[in-house]
Amino acid sequence: GIDRASRLVDQLLTLSRLDSLENLDDVDAIPLADLLQSAVMDIYHHAQRAGIEIRLNIHAQVTRSGQPLLLSLLVRNLLDNAVRYSPRGSAVDVTLNAQNFTVRDNGPGISPDALARIGERFYRPPGQDETGSGLGLSIVKRIAALHGMRVVLANAREGGFEVTVSW
């Protein structure tokens, strides 16, 4: 209870700060392969305990200008969701290409109705067993927008859910 409330307050404060930003301070050149590798390492043990394999595929060396902590939060939120909603024994693929990166899970995907609303603040698809506030993807979308990136949420052709962040 207290952990969930604390996480909700943290996410609300993060969104509030992001909403008030018009441009970014402390911008650095960020090698995205390093950023993704660090995020994968951070969640690796949690994923292993959940019985989920995380695979990192680097197909390009891309450097983007951005705020490191915010881009880290963006990737961490995506990985956290992918691990949370994937069944035990499945895999999460993180793939970096020249124009985008994707996070794809082997979960059930989501219904077309839910897909139309996912990423709205506080929206959670019906029938969720996992806890959450419905703010994580809103935070992802806002951070991406501040960095001139686009976020596409979709059911993957191979099954599961896929998030593509492109520039």
Q: What is the predicted function of each stretch?
A:
Residues 89-100:
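Short beta-strand/loop element within the Bergerat-fold HATPase_c
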Residues 28-29, 48, 53-63, 158:
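Conserved catalytic submotifs in the C-terminal HATPase_c
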Residues 20-26, 63-66:
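Conserved micro-motifs of the catalytic ATP-binding
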Residues 110-122:
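Short conserved segment of the HATPase_c
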